[in-house]
């Protein structure tokens, strides 16, 4: 049956009224009009589904607000006497709204609080930028190092950073901390605006490539490239000494003292120290204008000379020449520094350091913390004792006393090679209050024993805890060394008691008895020095004829490319003035040109230059010996090939060089 448009029917009523719920779980479904529009116009007439109560609607609206006056107040948990939380308190502390709380998002992972999107079908992969610690300018701090330890033993190391040298270039030796935030060339811009007076660091000679494994299948007459040069360790040491000796301070404000100029301060710390002379002392490196040699100048600030014989007491030290004493050359006073200063001129030993720097200086490689030092071998200690005893023999034999034997005033100039430094200073400073010579000589033995005891214990204050220090010596060294140290530390014994460290013969405590007691150690140290001398002699002998290579190079470069010599000879003989043809392709000296190209201008199969030191040394050695080995000399255009021997090349080179000498003599040169 057909119906007209708009006529009532049974299905038209179903589209106007609320949908009829179906199923048994539909009884708990509330009206959708309330959830969508907030109210239902058919609530009292036609709508069948149940509606939400008013207090529930108000609660949902209040939940959307940020501040709600109906929210429960904060109630802290209450604990029982035994410390446990009661069940009622635990239940009251958790709100029913906690189930609907949003997921916690840390603040560091989100830059801003964003509203969650309820209609996302796929989880969004948001990228959260990590938070960085905010930079807060603070005081520019230095390295974590003990200031007392670093100030006590801060020796001179020419191969470390030279930042501290600029602060000691002037007279005041004052240092100022760098401000990294200051505007100007003195701050962080110093790396781009270099100061022309900055100290130049030395080349890294110690970074040379070491000698690799040596082939063992060489014949008796075969050599490697390293056999033609001195050992790397000796070469590096000599190069470091030469580099240190040539160090200067550009734009230095240090004055010229007498004939000494180009002063360079060797103290790397600007802190003043009055010990042990009683005056603030500095040490400089200077060049003498008389002989051009380098000397060390020790300066004592604010020294007032009250007696002329005091300064003349250094004349006796100038007559002492001993290998274990730093030689003294001159002593005088000056006002070049703006005050009355005492200057002691001594020999300069480059790249040397004191025994305090060698054995007691904190290791800077472990963040400024002093690392556990290695055990000092006993033969090293005996070497120190023998060398100081040799110095005391020369000093006491001249009627003088060292008066100052300490690790900070004993120089280590080479491996296990020490020298007494700062001699004659105490004689000048304490001239009026000087002790008797015999008493001062006896005190030299005590100071020597203290120094050896401190080095053996690796502690500068070991002599203050005598029993503990001697126990350490007993555990780590032989009884012979312990007996020697005890003899040195004991005071002057009365007459008729044993005085030698090994022999019970009575006598006074002097240097002769001491040398007699350590005679066996004298022989051991002397034998070691002989072996070291033999090694240096063999190394020097290896370099004896190294100049013959230079002589060949000089001859080749003087003879080659000299056609004007032959032209002048022909002019004097009345022949044609054209250049001689001896250097032409058919000349008798043409092979000298080809030999030069054969030795120095080698190329590979692709025409690339080849720099082979072994080939150059091999050819020059064979040329110097004049062997009969034949070589093929090829011209640069590869059109001429000459087969000659090294003997023929050597003979032609000598003839050409003799002609050059005769031509020079003929012109009066």
UniProtKB/Swiss-Prot annotation:
Residues 520-558 form a coiled coil. Residues 1-25 are annotated as: Disordered. Residues 559-669 are annotated as: Knob domain. Keywords: ATP-binding, Coiled coil, Cytoplasm, Metal-binding, mRNA processing, Nucleotide-binding, Zinc, Zinc-finger. It is found in: Cytoplasm. ATP binds at residues 298, 347-354, 408-409. Residues 247-519 are annotated as: Pseudokinase domain. InterPro entries: Kinase-like_dom_sf, PAN3, Pan3_PK. GO terms for molecular function: ATP binding; poly(A) binding; zinc ion binding. A zinc finger (C3H1-type) spans 25-54. It holds the Pfam family Pan3_PK. The keyword Protein transport does not apply. It comes from the Eukaryota. GO terms for biological process: mRNA processing; nuclear-transcribed mRNA poly(A) tail shortening. Regulatory subunit of the poly(A)-nuclease (PAN) deadenylation complex, one of two cytoplasmic mRNA deadenylases involved in mRNA turnover. PAN specifically shortens poly(A) tails of RNA and the activity is stimulated by poly(A)-binding protein PAB1. PAN deadenylation is followed by rapid degradation of the shortened mRNA tails by the CCR4-NOT complex. Deadenylated mRNAs are then degraded by two alternative mechanisms, namely exosome-mediated 3'-5' exonucleolytic degradation, or deadenylation-dependent mRNA decaping and subsequent 5'-3' exonucleolytic degradation by XRN1. The N-terminal zinc finger binds to poly(A) RNA. Contains a pseudokinase domain. The protein kinase domain is predicted to be catalytically inactive because some of the residues important for catalytic activity are substituted and it lacks the equivalent of the binding site for a peptide substrate. However, it has retained an ATP-binding site and ATP-binding is required for mRNA degradation, stimulating the activity of the PAN2 nuclease in vitro. Belongs to the protein kinase superfamily. PAN3 family. This is PAN2-PAN3 deadenylation complex subunit PAN3. It comes from Phaeosphaeria nodorum (strain SN15 / ATCC MYA-4574 / FGSC 10173). The lineage of its organism: Eukaryota, Fungi, Dikarya, Ascomycota, Pezizomycotina. The gene is PAN3.
């Amino acid at each position: 049956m057909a119906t007209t448009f708009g006529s009532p029917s049974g299905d038209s009523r179903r589209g106007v009224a609320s949908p009829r719920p179906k199923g048994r779980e539909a009884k708990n479904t509330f009206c959708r009009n309330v959830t969508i529009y907030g109210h239902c116009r058919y609530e009292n007439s036609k709508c069948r589904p149940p509606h939400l109560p008013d207090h529930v609607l108000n609660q949902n609206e209040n939940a959307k607000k940020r501040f709600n006056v109906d929210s429960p107040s904060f109630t802290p948990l209450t604990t029982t006497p035994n410390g446990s939380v009661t069940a009622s308190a635990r239940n009251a502390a958790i709100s029913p709204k906690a189930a609907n709380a949003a997921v916690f998002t840390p603040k560091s992972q989100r830059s801003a609080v964003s509203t969650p999107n309820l209609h996302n079908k796929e989880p969004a992969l948001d990228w959260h930028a990590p938070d960085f610690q905010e930079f807060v300018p603070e005081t520019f701090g230095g390295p974590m190092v003990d200031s007392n330890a670093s100030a006590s033993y801060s020796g001179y190391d020419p191969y470390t950073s030279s930042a501290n040298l600029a602060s000691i270039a002037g007279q005041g030796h004052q240092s100022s901390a760098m401000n990294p935030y200051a505007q100007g060339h003195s701050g962080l811009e110093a790396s781009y605006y270099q100061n022309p007076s900055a100290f130049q660091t030395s080349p890294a000679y110690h970074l040379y490539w070491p000698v690799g494994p040596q082939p063992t299948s060489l014949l008796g007459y075969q050599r490697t490239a390293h056999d033609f040069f001195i050992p790397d360790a000796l070469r590096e040491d000599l190069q470091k000494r030469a580099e240190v000796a040539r160090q200067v301070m550009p734009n230095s404000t240090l004055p010229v003292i007498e004939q000494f100029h180009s002063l360079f301060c060797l103290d790397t710390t600007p802190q003043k120290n009055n010990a042990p002379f009683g005056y603030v002392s500095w040490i400089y490196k200077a060049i003498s204008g008389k002989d051009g040699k380098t000397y060390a100048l020790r300066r004592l600030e604010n020294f007032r000379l009250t007696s002329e014989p005091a300064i003349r007491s250094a004349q006796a030290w100038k007559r002492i020449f001993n290998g274990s004493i730093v030689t003294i050359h001159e002593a005088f006073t000056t006002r070049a520094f703006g005050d009355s200063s005492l200057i002691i001129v001594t020999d300069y030993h480059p790249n040397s350091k004191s025994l305090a720097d060698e054995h007691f200086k904190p290791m800077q490689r472990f963040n400024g913390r002093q690392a556990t030092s290695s055990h000092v071998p006993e033969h090293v200690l005996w070497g120190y004792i023998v060398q100081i005893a040799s110095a005391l023999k020369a000093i006491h034999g001249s009627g003088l006393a060292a008066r100052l034997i300490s690790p900070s005033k004993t120089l280590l100039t080479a491996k296990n090679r020490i020298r007494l430094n700062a001699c004659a200073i105490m004689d000048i400073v304490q001239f009026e209050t000087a002790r008797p010579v015999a008493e001062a000589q006896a005190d030299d033995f005590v100071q020597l024993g203290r120094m050896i005891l401190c080095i053996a214990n690796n502690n500068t204050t070991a002599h203050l805890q005598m029993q503990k220090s001697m126990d350490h010596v007993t555990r780590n060294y032989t009884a012979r060394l312990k007996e020697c140290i005890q003899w040195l530390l004991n005071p002057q014994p009365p007459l008729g008691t044993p005085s030698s460290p090994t022999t019970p013969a009575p006598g006074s405590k002097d240097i002769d008895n001491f040398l007699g007691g350590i005679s066996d150690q004298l022989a051991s140290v002397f034998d070691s020095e002989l072996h070291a001398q033999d090694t240096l002699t063999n190394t020097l002998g290896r370099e004896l004829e190294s100049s013959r290579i230079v002589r060949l190079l000089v001859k080749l470069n003087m003879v080659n490319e000299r056609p004007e010599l032959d032209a002048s000879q022909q002019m004097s003989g009345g022949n044609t003035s054209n250049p001689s043809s001896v250097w032409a392709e058919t000349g008798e000296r043409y092979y000298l040109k080809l030999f030069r190209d054969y030795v120095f201008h080698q190329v590979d199969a692709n025409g690339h230059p080849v720099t082979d030191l072994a080939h150059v040394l091999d050819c020059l050695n064979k040329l110097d010996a004049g062997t009969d080995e034949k070589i093929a000399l090829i011209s640069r255009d590869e059109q001429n090939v000459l087969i000659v021997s090294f003997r023929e090349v050597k003979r032609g080179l000598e003839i050409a060089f003799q002609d050059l000498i005769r031509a020079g003599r003929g012109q009066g040169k």
